[in-house]
């Protein structure tokens, strides 16, 4: 049976931390940034951690071997 492939879209959007959590960049920085405050834009630059069942499903089905 062949090895499972990691989805290319997931490789571009998520990364695994050393403890096994999913790191993802925040959405909402493509356009319409004039209406946001400087504080909102500054906070959107940081990464966030995806937790819960969504993260488990992504790791299990879309990243079977993690991201190398």
Curated annotation (Swiss-Prot):
Q: Which InterPro entries match?
A: Ribosomal_bL35, Ribosomal_bL35-like, Ribosomal_bL35_CS, Ribosomal_bL35_sf
Presence of keyword Nucleotide-binding: no
| A GO-annotated cellular component | cytosolic large ribosomal subunit
Q: Which domain of life is it from?
A: Bacteria
Under the heading SUPFAM superfamilies, the entry gives:
L35p-like (SSF143034)
Q: Which GO terms describe its molecular function?
A: structural constituent of ribosome
Swiss-Prot/TrEMBL keywords: Ribonucleoprotein, Ribosomal protein
Any one Gene Ontology BP term: translation
- Decide whether keyword Metal-binding is in the record: no
What family does this belong to? Belongs to the bacterial ribosomal protein bL35 family.
Q: Which NCBIfam families match?
A: rpmI_bact (TIGR00001)
Q: Which PANTHER family has this protein been placed in?
A: 54S RIBOSOMAL PROTEIN BL35M, LARGE RIBOSOMAL SUBUNIT PROTEIN BL35M
The name under which this protein is listed is Large ribosomal subunit protein bL35
């Amino acid at each position: 049976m062949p090895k499972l492939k990691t989805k290319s879209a997931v490789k571009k959007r998520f990364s695994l931390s050393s403890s096994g959590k999913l790191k993802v960049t925040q959405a909402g920085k493509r356009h319409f940034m004039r209406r946001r405050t400087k504080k909102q834009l500054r906070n959107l630059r940081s990464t966030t951690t995806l937790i819960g069942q969504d993260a488990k499903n992504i790791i299990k089905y879309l990243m079977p071997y993690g991201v190398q």
